[in-house]
Regions:
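Cytoplasmic juxtamembrane regions at transmembrane-helix boundaries
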Residues: 84-112
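Extracytosolic (periplasmic/ER-lumenal) interhelical loops and adjacent juxtamembrane/interface segments
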Residues: 42-66
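Membrane-proximal helix-loop-helix units in multi-pass membrane proteins
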Residues: 112-153
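Hydrophobic alpha-helical transmembrane segments of polytopic
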Residues: 15-18, 22, 74-77, 81, ...
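Conserved small/polar residues in nucleotide/adenosyl-binding loops
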Residues: 156-164
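N-terminal signal-anchor transmembrane alpha helix
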Residues: 11-38
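Individual transmembrane alpha-helix segments
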Residues: 60-94
Length: 169
């Protein structure tokens, strides 16, 4: 068996596995969601076009039935992705920080990515029907944090000064 570089595992293999788990858990969560939408509590199951993503993480479905299984799957999937993102972004300064400016930009981007990842996990553990304000805070800040991360990492990419070593990946 070929030696697996640990950086390759954390930057390529683990994120792929996490993505598969995320999709599988979300699809299963949609399948077991009891039903109801914001405008029609009588609908059966989860509607991709009429339910909010966060409905799967609610304590009770929009039709009033308990939503425990879907809620657990929702929290698990967001936790898996959040932990994977934290691990991934902690390796980026080593990969992209080939000069002082890139190193600083990558670390600042990483800090925002960690913030976004924590917010992702927080979204999974704050059901919107039980603790609405914290849920919205976490959900909104996923996007705010990752926007800053994407901007900073784009600057590194656009500058073209991001040569990486073959040994890292």
């Amino acid at each position: 068996m070929k030696y697996l570089n640990p950086n390759h595992a954390m930057l390529v293999t683990v994120p792929r596995i996490a993505a598969v788990f995320f999709i599988a858990l979300q699809l299963l969560g949609m399948k077991v969601y009891p039903g109801g939408t914001m405008y029609d509590a009588s609908t059966q199951g989860y509607s991709f076009s009429k339910n909010f993503f966060s409905d799967m993480g609610a304590y009770a479905a929009r039709n009033g039935e308990p939503n425990y299984f879907s809620m657990i799957l929702f929290a698990m999937s967001l936790t898996i992705v959040g932990i994977t993102f934290i691990s991934y972004y902690l390796l980026l300064p080593k990969l992209l920080g080939n000069n002082r400016i890139n190193y600083i930009l990558t670390w600042v981007g990483t800090l925002f990515a960690i913030g976004g990842s924590v917010c992702m996990i927080g979204t999974g553990f704050t059901p919107s029907d039980v603790v609405f304000a914290p849920h919205v805070f976490f959900a909104n800040n996923i996007f705010h944090c990752f926007l800053v991360t994407a901007f900073l990492l784009s600057l590194i990419h656009i500058s073209g000064a991001h040569e990486t070593s073959e040994n890292l990946v």
